[in-house]
Amino acid sequence: MKYSDLRDFISQLEKIGQLKRITQPISTHLTMTEISDRTLRAKGPALLFENAVSESGEPYNMPVLTNLFGTPDRVALAMGQKDVGALRDVGKLLAMLKEPEPPKGFRDALGKIPVYKQVLNMPVKVIKKPLCQQIVLSGDDVDLTKMPIQSCWPGDVAPLITWGLTVTRGPHKERQNLGIYRQQVLSKNKVIMRWLSHRGGALDFQEFKKENPGEKYPVSVALGADPATILGAVTPVPDTLSEYAFAGLLRGAKTEVAKSISNDLEVPATAEIILEGYLDPEEMAPEGPYGDHTGYYNEVDNFPVMTVTHITMRKDAIYHSTYTGRPPDEPAILGVALNEVFVPILQKQFPEIQDFYLPPEGCSYRLAVVTIKKQYAGHAKRVMMGVWSFLRQFMYTKFVIVCDDDINARDWEDVIWAMTTRMDPSRDTVLIENTPIDYLDFASPVSGLGSKMGMDATNKWPGETNREWGEPIEMTQEIKNQVDELWDELDIL
């Protein structure tokens, strides 16, 4: 299903009982987080707080939307799919775009016509009078303190913008980059842009500084874009494909964009709110601490400051927000859904992979379980190295467990049985030191640098062991069938 904007998606969620309107006055200071967290853990609906107030009780006159992607099925719905399993089709499309193959013949070419039709929706459509610019604020009228920006946890240093889609462009790039980076509010017109050095926005900024020393770097931030555009910003799209183009594929219609008022960056035309401004390469500020998706408060570190020169918005704008904390939180739920997108991408490069699972309790990316159809001695170690190196999304994965295809990667009882019966700790553990690690990972000895562990929990082949390998116990199919026929009659359970 196509959603023209965030409001269209909200209407659909309300029709199917997946949106709850909260009319009571609710404070954006901590209370909204607690309500959202309890709702998410109960697998409840998206929440629209229609009467958001400040800590002192002052009304904001702007509703707040939280838990939009609070269940995997809502993520699938936002991607135009009926359920999470159908997201494998999205992954297959991305795998094809990442490494396209020519048709093997006329019949194969006919089979790929639907894909080619989808590709026609990739170019953006520029709108001259966009909804996102119905209201324009500049100069002294720019005041972020009038927006219902959440303070999520007791130890958070300041209100935090969490769902902003930051739009950047490198000096030698035609395509724009969309990334979601949290932004600490410093004052009425300044926020801190917290992006890690390997992320697209940070790389664009570094290239700009080299080419234009001392100059201000233009940035725009969209809040409340349509669901396809939001998810395009968090999906592992190929580097050659823009997030706007991928959003068009998801939506089945071209992404509508508009030129920012103060710069040449294109923003989602139907977004609820746009922040426009610049980064001064000389202006940095300490960011944090904030409660993060790890379940801990992160360290304070310096990041560039964005000066907001303009705020544009729709009439009766909705502020889209979230919180991050110990899983499950909204990023963890997104991770569960996007896991299905990753599987076909990995399988295209490594056909032996049967399943791939990132447990949400592992902070969505720090531990991976892979099952393979093992073909030779040492095969598991090759797969470990492949996972760490193939997609940048797995650069920070600390632990990779590889099992045979008789193990259910998503069942801890199965995985632990394989680890305890098929692993020798010395022989089957791979340790790699001094590798890139998420700087939020305070368990690493050095910020941003730590070790990785691979665990080979597969059955061992000749060359990997000198011992006779155990044969798993299993009942014959004939006896299973006999008991199946008797089972109801026995009335045991």
Curated annotation (Swiss-Prot):
Active site per UniProt: D292 (proton donor)
Gene3D superfamilies referenced in this protein's UniProt entry, alphabetically: Single helix bin, UbiD C-terminal domain-like
Species annotation: Colwellia psychrerythraea (strain 34H / ATCC BAA-681)
Name of the featured protein: 3-octaprenyl-4-hydroxybenzoate carboxy-lyase
The gene coding this protein: ubiD
Protein family (similarity comment): Belongs to the UbiD family.
Subcellular location: Cell membrane
Associated pathway: Cofactor biosynthesis; ubiquinone biosynthesis
Main EC class the enzyme belongs to: lyase
Protein purpose: Catalyzes the decarboxylation of 3-octaprenyl-4-hydroxy benzoate to 2-octaprenylphenol, an intermediate step in ubiquinone biosynthesis.
One Gene Ontology biological process: ubiquinone biosynthetic process
Membrane topology: Peripheral membrane protein
Summary of subunit composition and partner proteins: Homohexamer.
